[in-house]
Amino acid sequence: MISKASYDNFYYQLEKYINEEEQSNELYEISVYFRDLKNGPIFGFNELTEFIPASLLKVPTVMVFLNSAENQPELLTYKISYTGTTTVARQEVKPKESAKPNTLYTIEELLRLTLIYSDNASLNMLQTFLNENPQRLKLREETFQELGLIDPRTKSENTLTVRGYASLFRLLYNVSFLNAEMSEKILQWLAESDYQIGLRAGVPGNIKIAHKFGERFFESDDVRQLHDCGIIYYPDNPYLLCVMTKGSDFNKLQSVIQHISEMVYEEVDSRKI
């Protein structure tokens, strides 16, 4: 267990670090959200700033399928084939494993590839499966609305705040949306993520972390966005950390996320009682 004292002093250290990094002109915007998952303190930095979620939306997409699978377990063994003809969105962080053309995959295999390797080809197959059926498409929309990811008036899902996205991990951790089996399935896949930079790099290797990153690059204005959010399973006192960034250089954004992860872990570790 760790102390539940205020994080005010640490917040000032974090703010100082962020201000220094913003002077480099490589970091344009950043949001940070922290929550002690054992009824402890919460703090946020620019937590209502909006970012493009990109691959972060793979988590709620997987939640749509597992929500259905609670009542239709056969859904996870249903097989679909990847033709390889659809355009796959560009990824700065290339997946180490990806769905292969002219190959049959079960829904569960595609869900796993989507989260562990952030594979866009697998995501495309899952989205096509949803889009082919009006009832499935409606279920996706209703699920996203329930998770607070779509404004019911505008049907827009173009932007997301760090606080809003972090709530998904609280739902999974507290088993508040999916049942225990399905919540654990998602968290285990996220714990197997092959993205070893960002949050993961700021935490000792023996500490489990279930996280998802998202990245977006616009060639028109040379602006990059990189985000990493997850649960760090500090012994007997897990915590939630989510960092969203916008800047000109992916390496800089990765470095900033890693350093903030290090700062938070060291602060949490110093509070051990």
Question: Over which residues does each language-model region extend?
Answer:
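Solvent-exposed coil/turn segments that connect beta secondary-structure elements
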Residues: R35-N39, L48-E50, S68, T85-T87, ...
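Active-site SXXK
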Residues: G40, I52-T83, L241
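Short glycine/serine- and small hydrophobic-enriched flexible loop segments
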Residues: M63-N71, T128, S167-N174, Y265-E266
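Active-site-proximal beta-strand/loop segments in catalytic clefts of secreted hydrolases
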Residues: R35-L37, G84-T85, T114-S118, L126, ...
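Short, conserved catalytic-motif segment at the N-terminal edge
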Residues: N19, E26-E50
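Structured C-terminal helix/loop/strand segments within mature extracytoplasmic catalytic/sensor domains
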Residues: M1-S24, I42, P134, Y173-Q196, ...
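Active-site-adjacent helix/loop patches that line small-molecule binding or acyl-intermediate pockets
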Residues: I2-F10, G84, Q91, P95-W189
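Short amphipathic alpha-helical face segments that pack within enzyme cores
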Residues: V59-V64, G164-S167, H259
